[in-house]
Amino acid sequence: RGAARPGAQGRQAWRSWVTAKPIVPREQANRDIDQAISYYLSEDAEQAALGFIDAVEQAYAHLSLHPATGSPRYAHELNLPRLRCWPLARYPHLLFYVERPDHIDVWRVLHGQRDIPAWMQEPDDI
């Protein structure tokens, strides 16, 4: 009765058609992540720090498979045509990246309340 649903093997076969791009964070993005983790730990919020790490890993996994899903909102504001951002689940941070032909170039991971244009000062190699 009803249509058959794909099982684990069906999902794996489907995933083989999708090519994941490697995530390559810039040094500044890694520093942003380290600073956020340090902040949560300084507030005795170890679970929040661990959750933040999970949220970053989930964002990386998603963007690796679906890089075009990020918002181009700041691309227009900053006049950086290919810049996209993706919100971290359950955290007020945005992951800023550019899709390259062979990888995802992660620029920054910033708290959404920051002055994003001021924090996005990067070389013009987009």
Positions of PLM-derived features:
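Enriched for short, Lys/Arg-rich terminal
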Residues: P6-W17, L88-I126
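Basic, Lys/Arg-enriched alpha-helical interface segments
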Residues: G2, Q9-L83, P117-I126
